[in-house]
C-alpha cells in the first residue's frame, strides 16, 4: 500500500532560499500522500549524508531520496543500498557513479541553465562583456555543469570574457564576501560588465556588496543568476537584478512516483528533467506577489 511507504530523505542543508523551498515541498508532498518521511539535514557535509543513507538502509526504508552535496564518493554507500534492494532517487543533482547504482535522477539540466544565462547575456551586451562569476559549492554537479553550460556559449564570443571566478558556496554571505573581493581587485565596477551567479542567494549577497561600494546593480553591473527564489523577483522589481532562470523545487512528486513505479516493476527513465524558464523584470512584481 502506498500509504505505508517509508522514505528516507538526505538533504544537503539549508544554504539557500531555494534549498529550503525544496525541503518544504518534498515534506508537504510526502504528507499529502500519507508517507512516513525520515528527514536528515547534512549541514553541507558528505560524511553526514553517507551516515544518513546507512541509517535509512538499517531502518529498512522503502526508498531513499538523496540530494548529493558533491558528485564523487558515493559508490560504496549506493552499492549498500542496492544490496538491500532499496531504490535511491537522486534529487536536483547528479553523482559520478555507475547509473545502475541508483534508480533515477530528478533534476534540471544545469548545463542548459548556464547556457540560457549566457545566451541572454550575449544578446543583452551584443557579445561584448567582462564577466565576474560566483560559482556554487566546489565539486557540486550544479556548479560544474552551470559553468560548463555558460562557458560553452561565451566561447563563441571573443569579446565575452570571465575575468574573475570564485566559489561563493551557494550562500548569500559567500556571494557578498567574494563580490567585495572582486570589486576591490578590479578597482570598482569600471572593468566589470556583468555578474553571473550560480544561484540567486549569491547574487543577492553580491547586490548588497555592490550597493555598499557605491556601485549600481543593473546600471553599472548586469546581474543574472539561477533559481527564481522570491527575493530575486523583489530585487528585479526594485531594479537591482536583470534575469533569473527557474530551478524547479517541486521534485517530490516525480521522485515518489519513480519509487512507486519501480515497486511495480515498471521501467523508470534514468533522468527525469525538470527545467524552468528565464524570468525578466517585466513580470517580477507579479511573480514576487505569487511566491513570497
What is the predicted role of each segment?
Residues 66-82, 150, 164, 168-234:
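Hydrophobic alpha-helical
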Residues 7, 49, 105-131, 144-145, ...:
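Hydrophobic alpha-helical segments within soluble ligand-binding/sensing domains
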Residues 6-33, 37-51, 55, 59-61, ...:
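Extracytoplasmic "Venus flytrap"
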Residues 18-35, 113-117, 141-160, 174-179, ...:
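Short, solvent-exposed amphipathic alpha-helices that sit
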Residues 72-112, 123, 130, 136, ...:
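Flexible loop/hinge segments that line or gate small-molecule binding clefts
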Residues 1-6, 31-32, 36, 76-86, ...:
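Short, low-complexity disordered leader/linker segments with a strong preference
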Residues 5, 134, 138-142, 153-154, ...:
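Hinge/cleft segment of the Venus flytrap/periplasmic-binding protein
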